[in-house]
Amino acid sequence: LMDSIPMVVITGQVPTTLIGTDAFQECDTVGITRSCTKHNWLVSDINDLAAVLHEAFHVARSGRPGPVVVDIPKDIQFASGTYVSPEHAPRRHKRTVRPVDRSRINEALELMARAKRPIFYTGGGVINAGPGASEALRELARATDFPVTSTLMGLGAFPASEPQWLGMLGMHGSWEANHAMHDCDVMICVGARFDDRVTGRLDAFSPHSTKIHIDIDPSSINKNVRVDVPIIGDVAYVLEEMLRVWKSKTMQVDKAALKAWWKQIDQWRAKKSLTYKPNADVIMPQYALQRLQEHIKGRDHYITTDVGQHQMWAAQFLDFEEPNRWLTSGGLGTMGYGVPAAVGVQVAHPKALTVCVSGDASFLMNMQEMTTAVQFRLPIKVMILNNKYMGMVRQWQQLLHGNRMSESYNESMPDFVKLADAFGATGIRCDKPGKLDDAIALMIKTPGPVIFDCVVATLANCFPMIPSGKAHNEMILGADITDAEVENAIGEEGKALV
């Protein structure tokens, strides 16, 4: 639900005659899933089944996408009934398409034309709105020459190779993206929801900006941050309409102010906030992903990740030129997502290179899905950044608990090469920077599923970072930071916000 995944889950239930009797394996599936789905159904009449299934797929995909559950008792599964086609099925959940307020679009465009320090803040809603939304965003950004940043879920909506791209924003975003967000005077939020990983301290979030918010979900408007110009509607349609009006009115930006704004942004870029200390003896995780980027550049490829430090480093060091090439759990942040996601991607795109960037702990959450990859001959490549820790947990224990480690060190990790062999896949291991390129090349060219155990520095921290409870302009960088500075980065109030 938090990742906006349109998923239809069909579950089994005890026969209708036993519901409510605490029968063997009875479970109140509808009650349990009510809080984490868009809607759910318990089918009690076989003649309702077809209509319910049609409606389930409609609800999952309409508006802001999300999961739904259809619970089917055992006697209903064995029964025969009348099939109803989607066109003739009664629909209880009729989506009300409210007309987009054109006056709001005009108001937004006037603000953009007068802006001195504008920025596009984009999110996963641009991806979910389809390729047309990403294309419209690109055209509108090029027409205005405004800088563009994105949330974790929105990567790929705007090309990373474009000079207007500032990188990801938020807790582990770039220096230039976060400072531009803090200092902007007009913010155009497109398909994002102002979540806590992006905003930092709310009362200090972009304090001097006029905020435009475009979103299909009315409940996202003014939920976390008060906006000045709300535009409720399909992101693709709204962006296309904004672009049409901008061109038809031959609207112009304040070029002098925009030139000064880009000069300031270039000064922030000069910080090179993703810089890290290289190591000739140990593979730094950032270096591993930089090398992966060089090997996959120009290929038809998809990246999935699990959740943790490796996820943030992948977002920082891998470049995405197109939408839907990056699949990660950035809303709920659930470990174990990467491998099954890679399996799904490979089924959908059998000829593409599919790489799952994982961590040693995350991989173990759903490693059984390697059997699926082997069984169906899906050549997914799982690149494990193995630091022998739950890295993000360890980093927070250093930040919040005086470096007192608890349950975050994985002393009894399996031999991932032998584990790959046990699954019937290919295992590769590398722990030397000088051999890393050969190992990545071997991973890519090896037929079938591969587990690549990339042994990286154990205590590397993920920077840059906005400490919890701090504002965008209070970021800390990682290149020269001391352990003492890390441990004192978060105050007492911020500790409760992690």
Segments from the language model and where they lie:
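N-terminal alpha/beta PP-like core and its mobile active-site loop of ThDP/TPP-dependent enzymes
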Residues: L1-V253, V282, R291, P379-I384, ...
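Thiamine diphosphate
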Residues: I10, L18-Q25, S134, N178, ...
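Short, surface-exposed connector motifs at secondary-structure boundaries
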Residues: H39, A113-F120, H295-G298, P323, ...
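Generic enzyme active-site microenvironment
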Residues: V69, H213, T304, V357-S358
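Glycine-rich, N-terminal phosphate-binding loop of Rossmann-like dinucleotide-binding domains
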Residues: T122, V190-G191, V307, S358, ...
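Gly/Ser/Thr-rich loops at beta-strand to alpha-helix junctions
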Residues: G124-N128, Q309-H310, S362
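Structural motif
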Residues: V186, Y302, L353-V355
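Active-site diphosphate/adenylate-binding microenvironment
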Residues: K263-P340, V345
